[in-house]
Structures are given as structure tokens and as C-alpha cells.
Amino acid sequence: MAEELLFRKDVKKELTWDLSLIYKDEDALMADAARLESLTAQLEKDYKGRLDSADRINECLDKLREIYGIVTLVGNYCELATSVDYYDTHNMELAGRMNRRISECMSSLSFIDSELSAKSDELINEAAQASKENANYLKEVLREKPHLLSPETEKVLKALSQTTGAPYEIYNTAKLADMKFPDFEVDGKKYPLGYSLFEDDYEYDERTDVRRAAFAAFSAKLHDYENVTAAAYNTAVQYEKTMSDLRGFDNVFDSLLFGQHVDRTLYNRQIDLIMDKLAPHMRKYAKLLGRVHKLDKVTYADLKLPVDPEYSPKLTIEESKDYVTKGLSILGEDYVNMVERAYTERWFDFAQNQGKSTGGFCASPYGKNSFILLSWNGRMSDVFTIAHELGHAGHFKACNAAQSIFDTDVSCLLYTSPSPRD
């Protein structure tokens, strides 16, 4: 039976990730934030209105790379700290302050793209040929030139970046801090409920009455928040539509795909393949689940059931390490060493606690190790999540080590398409 979710302060330290691998303490974070502001002010003073040669352009971008590195560390530290506990008011307030400081710096630096876009293509190409580290940044300037707004407008948009991200923050706050799930009851027995308890435990429970009751109780609570969720989503969609129009795209699809370097025909093909080719197999899969588990009918609450219950043993975290290490050993010694480091250096946040983000993700701040979030339930699905996220870690370990920070912001299509989970 699933256990009541703990508060973050009550979980075991060994189940949490070690953010001191980014900054040893908050003082170190604040020192880097101050350095960020100092470097930003100096760069603006030295280069605003003076990007008139290939050498000057590359000098400016060399210093911008250092600034981007600090932004990545400060931003990741704060985001990771808040992602595990939306009830931690100190970390939430700290993240708000740091995000405001980052927005102010990015607003001050918006002159770079505006001024570069006003230069001739010949000058930008000359600068790109002179610096491997800055080449892709400069090529992106040329690609985005037709969609850039006035310098004043771009500066304002950068300053408002924290505000324009509000819809997702509102959604997460409602989901992780405000929603209080009641216990549900089956045959006179009460069961605790929460986001991760449902998504990572009850959805896989082979007791049909418990699984479906959990689904009903979970869905009922989501229904209570449908209006605020819809309002937040609508705000995000309206913002994307407005920006698409302002930047001269034909529609929102083209605007969003442009940012991901994805051609519209490729996107349409993927959607068509899923609907036309995958759908029949998924219907067969649902019928198979019904036969294996002897269900009267297959509902949405039943789709996460294991096809082979005997293939889903309960596991410890240490046992997961053995599965993952053996499974990924084919990728070589460096990969196995990375897996070992991930476990021993606490790259993972395994804890189940109230206020923690759901699902799983891997963050790989430039120049540091990766950080992987999940809620451990001791199922084989958790092992697959670990292997999946370590795949991202391995990708960005190699990517970050070999390339300029300008070249590590890769398209979602590149890093998700190889994964069957995405």
C-alpha cells in the first residue's frame, strides 16, 4: 500500500540530490549573481554601439559566453531547488529574486542581437568564420533577422521574461502547492492520494478496484482546478499567438517550430504517423491488457498496467543501479563510470514528498554534472525512467564538454526523438 507523502524536511538525505555540486552554499550563489551583474554592466559599457568589426563582435560574444555560463548555473540552481518543494517559501522567494536579476541582465544585453541584425550579412559571416565558438550564434542571428523587432521592443520583452513565464508558474503552483488530495476508500479501507502517488503507484496497481477508485478521486480533484488551469493555458496560447503575429510568422505552429529548427512538413508527418500508424497498434495493446488482466472493459485508468506482471518486480534503489549499469554497459566504460558517479555523487532526487514536481527530468547545467528528478516507487518503470534520463545526461555530458555554450541549446527533436518514451 502506498504511504502518505512526507514533507520535504522529513525525507532521508540520501534520497535527495546534492545541489552543492553547483554552489557549495547560498553565499556562493549570491556571489555569482553579483558577478553576473558586474560582467553585464561592463559588457554593455564596452560594446554597446561599437560592434563595428569582426574582431569586436567576437570579443563581445566571448564575454557573453561567460555570462551565459553564470546564468545557466544560477538559473538551474534555483529551479532545481524549487522543483522538489513548492512549499519552501525561502527557495521560492530566492528563485524569484534571482530570476528578476537575470531578466534585468538579459534586457541590458538585448542590444547585442539588435545591433548584429543591423549589420551586413557579410560582416556577420566574416565574424562567424573567424570563431568556431561563436559561429552558430552568429548564424542564428542571420536566421532570426527577419523576425526581430525594434531594439526597444526586444529590450522590453527580455525584461518581461519572468512575467511571460507566469502561466506555467501558475499551473505548477496550483498543481504542486494548492491541490490537496483527499484519501479515497475501497471496501472500507482508506488510501492516501497525491500527484506522484497516483502517477507513479496507483496507475500501475493490479487491483482494479483500487486503481479505478484512485483514478476517479484524482480526476475529481483535477476537475476542481479546471478553470484556473484553462485560464493559465489560454494565457500562454494567446501570448504565443501575439508573438507569432508580431514577429511575422504565418501562424503559431511555424513560430514554435522555427525556434526548434523543425520543418513544418516533418512535424505534420510525425503527427500523421502517430494517428494513422501507431493508433491501430495502441488499440491492440489496450485489448491485450484487457485479456491479460481479465478486465470487464478497458478504461483510461487501466492503460498503465504491465503487460506481464511477473516482469515488474519490486526493486530497491541499489538493485536499480545494477540493472541500469548492466543495461548501459554496451555503451562503454565512460558511460558506466557516469552511471556510477550519478549514484554515488547524488545526481538523483529519488524522494517522494509533498510539493515535489511530478514525472521525471534531467537538467545538465553547462560545466557541471546532470541532475535527475523522479519519485522512486520501486517499480521497473522507475528503472526505465533512470535509464532514460541518464541517456540525456550522457548526451549533454559529451555535448557540453566538446562545444561552446552557444552550441548546447539543441532542438527538442534532437534529444527526444531517439527515445521511445517521447
Give the positions of each predicted feature:
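Short acidic (Asp/Glu) and glycine-rich catalytic loops that position anionic groups and cofactors
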Residues: D10-L15, A301-K304, Y366-S370, F396-A402
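Short pre-active-site segment immediately N-terminal to the catalytic Zn-binding motif
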Residues: L373-I386
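Conserved small/polar residues in nucleotide/adenosyl-binding loops
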Residues: Y415-D422
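Catalytic glutamate of the conserved HExxH
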Residues: T385, E389, A393
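A well-structured
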Residues: M1-E310, K321
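Auxiliary, metal-adjacent structural segments of Zn-dependent hydrolase domains
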Residues: Y311-Y366, R379-M380
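Peripheral/terminal regions associated with large enzymatic or DNA-binding modules
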Residues: E240-M243, N251, F258, D349-A363, ...
